[in-house]
Amino acid sequence: RALLLSYWRWAMSTWVRAASASIALIDEVEYGLEPHRLARLLDSLGAKDDGELLQTFMTSHSPVALRELTADQVFVVRTQLDRHRVRRVGAVDDIQGMLRKNAEAFLAKSIVVCEGASEVGFGRGLDQYWSNKGHTSFFALGGAYVDSGGSEPDRCFEQGSALLKLGYRVLVLADADKPPTPVVVQAFHDAGGESVTWRQGRALEDELFHSLSDEGIDELLAKAIDIHGRDLVNDHIK
């Protein structure tokens, strides 16, 4: 706590000194700060102000910091051969909501954009299983998942295209029960994205029950009953 208090005093004194300057530089802005203190520091530096009294350049690997900023305030910096390339997140359309909901993804190198929360859970479950078998985790390799909301089949491809423009490697995992617009899918693939889906006309739950053995289905139902109760599971089956 003494360390945090000391850091907080240093941060505030830095801000006071910077108030009379035009530029402030901060490396790893989240270091030593609890989330609510980090949010307050960013506010103090003008994260929510429209004016430009102080120009701040800072680095961060914190999703908490990213959520406190607008897309126009965030830049992705990558090394390409012998140079660095800087891309402004706000230059990409329809990105602000993704920054708020899936801030962790912007700190990754490779992203799996999932149609909904079920696909995210499925991917994380497989990753955990493979990790327990001795394979390197997707997260350890710099990967992240994005939940596109599951509302429209085009949505995950549109979000995937937006992330491609920022230099991320992107894979879309989508259901096949509601076909997306072909031109949207083609634009995503033309930009370098990849996608996987189930067999024709199937969603995740369809594919699971068509692919699992009888014993596997029994285990899946037993797990559902254990979590949600027999009555609720029975109502959904009806």
Question: What residues fall within each predicted segment?
Answer:
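Conserved nucleotide-binding/hydrolysis micro-motifs of P-loop NTPases
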Residues: S62-A65, L81-D82, S118-E119, A176-P179, ...
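Switch/communication elements of ASCE P-loop NTPase nucleotide-binding domains
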Residues: R1-E104
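Hydrophobic/aromatic beta-strand patches that form the interior of the parallel beta-sheet core
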Residues: F57, F75, L171-L173, V196-T197
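Short glycine-/polar-rich loops that comprise or flank the Walker A/P-loop
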Residues: A21, T70-Q73, A108, A140-G142, ...
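Conserved helicase/translocase motor-coupling segment
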Residues: S110-Q186
